[in-house]
Amino acid sequence: MKKLFFSFVFMLLPLMAMAQQSVPAFKFGYFSYDKVLHAMADYATATRSYNDLKAKYDAETKRSVEDFNSRYEDFLDVQRKLEPSILRKRQAELEELMDRNIAFRKESERLLKKAEEDIYAPVHAKLNNAVRQMGKESGYAFILNADNNSVPFVNTAMGEDVTEALIAALK
């Protein structure tokens, strides 16, 4: 039994040695997501679109604040001359206007956040698809996002910076 076992092990040794020699080289890529994203023409277009929308909301917010301020100043000018019932009515109107302004501001922030996600989603999808495609074509095991000091060390013998290649591919 021992002879059979040892002969089997000796037959497997050359196979195991060949298997270790044929291990493919492990390689990966890394890039700066922000640098590539900001270099994309689609990102500039999306940013302009978002900024236009934000400017419209900001203008409406400014208009409503100015309207409230002018009404409040008018109220302060005539406050001492008003009857108590009219005074309470005007105060209630101002409070309601202020509450509506606060509600509008919160709603506009929510809508702007959603619009930002919707506007930039196709840009992020395009970049992610390009990264995926480059990884497949170049045979990378994975591609890392090196922003925010998330990858403090990269061995350049094993990893390759694909930032410029991605920028070129997305133009």
Regions found by a protein language model. Give the residues of each.
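Bacterial Sec-dependent N-terminal signal peptides
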Residues: M1-V23
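Amphipathic, charged alpha-helical segments and their helix-to-coil junctions
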Residues: Q20-K171
